[in-house]
Amino acid sequence: MRYLTAGESHGPKLVGILEGVPSGAKIDKETIDQALQERQKGPGRGGRMKIEKDQITILSGVRGGLTTGAPIALEIINRDWANWEKIMAWGDEADLESRKVMTPRPGHADLTGYLKYRTEVRNVLERASARETAMRVAIGNIAVQILEALGVEIRGQVLSVGKVHMDSEDTPEYWQRVQASEWKVGDPKGEEALDAQLQEARSQGESLGGVLQIQVRNLLPGLGSYVQWDRKLDGRLAQAVLSVQAIKGVAFGMGFTAGQHFGSEVHDPIGYDSGRGYYRYSNNAGGIEGGMTNGEPVIIEAVMKPIPTLYSPLSTVNLETKEVMEASVERSDVCAVPAALVVLKHVAAWEILQAILEKFPADTWDELDKAWQDYKRFVSEQ
């Protein structure tokens, strides 16, 4: 499978094309729209989210609620385009002077993109913007729906925002609280501290980052491969996660703390039970060993840096005069960590489904489902 996206933050539309999805898979448009709406939510979001009401339009590749095997084309309308139509026009009528950006923002693609592509900063930031992730959520939700039909579950939580760290557990009640929380946390006391921290950051013109966790459950062992470097599933998941705007680090299982322990404290002892087959007594590896799933939940943690646009701007250099000035201010969020969690779940889902289709090549949903169930039976009998 593969996909491409196109579109600018303030252009008329975001578009996506994906191919390689088996035919006959059930796809529900409302479920995609719900994921898009979830991405728009969360404390700390900016004024743009009050303008947009993201919904997907399926242009091809799905008929009667089932994939056809043809490329799937998608689009999302940018409602804010109405306010930028003259500025973002493609022809000679474009107003190139209004909203021109001459003071690049530290931490953003502005300056480096300006140097690399020899184009205006406006053109750089329009494509580098995290607005692009709306389409990646839509594309990834197609993968989510197929994975769920196979019995695979993807969940996530926010572990920390700024200096506030959450107490985490793994019970049905806890995950219900996470799902109901605007912050996507299961710690009520922590949620109160997050609200207070957000108000402090907003009053100071600051922004906030955080640490997020994704869990992928009910995967069979053997997805990915140790045979070549580019087939290792943890490497591919890491690349997908790090490709999301503002994500600066990724870890699996124990992550970087593994370097602080003896090997006997890190590696997961193997057990066997006639009912469940082989299993691990712990999951410090985060569900991946040798680049392959081992049957335990895949646990991914990622760190999101604070958003580069600050309402109390840092210093920068004017591209024309070379004078030191304050960086430009674009309309932005104070905190988008819960929204980033939605994006990470969906980019991870795409990589997981791709790994499944590499192990079980299939042109149709029925072929994929049969291969998955046959292998599941084989694993349980070993």
Swiss-Prot record:
SUPFAM superfamilies: Chorismate synthase, AroC. It catalyses: 5-O-(1-carboxyvinyl)-3-phosphoshikimate = chorismate + phosphate. GO terms for biological process: amino acid biosynthetic process; aromatic amino acid family biosynthetic process; chorismate biosynthetic process. Pfam families: Chorismate_synt. InterPro entries: Chorismate_synth (IPR000453), Chorismate_synth_AroC_sf (IPR035904), Chorismate_synthase_CS (IPR020541). NADP(+) binds at R39, R45. It comes from the Bacteria. Reduced FMN (FMNH(2)). NCBIfam families: aroC, PRK05382.1. Belongs to the chorismate synthase family. This is Chorismate synthase. The gene is aroC.
